Amino acid sequence: LSVSLSMNPLYQKCLAIVIIGLILTQCGKKKSSQAYVQEGIKYSNQGNYDKAKESFLKAVEEDPKNLAGHYGLGGIYNLEKQYIAAEKSFKSTIQLDPTHYNAWYSLGYTYELMGKTKDAEISYTKYRRLKEKMDSIMNKEKH
């Protein structure tokens, strides 16, 4: 008598273990990039900047195009007086979204902290232009 494979109790146990394993790996999925950003913001608001930095780093690792992750990192780097790293983070934000006026302002502030007044003024000028355009658009939508 031949016993079919699907009726074999050992086969059924192995299959059950594989299915449970697949289900459990789905339950243990990594957080999304946005979830890491939200976590980073929460930690920043609590003054826990080391944890915030860790969360923002995970956000950009998970999604290198995450604007908020790069922007949050820039702020943390400024607090840590790591101005070159802050400059890089804000430039990454701007590269992904050239209209991100807060990133232009923050880049200007970083340049100011670095003593690069000409670069700071260029960034502040771009910030003001973008902010004025955004405010103009928002005012038109209100009326």
Locations of regions flagged by a protein language model:
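Terminal, low-structured helical/coil segments at or just beyond the last alpha-helical repeat
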Residues: 112-143
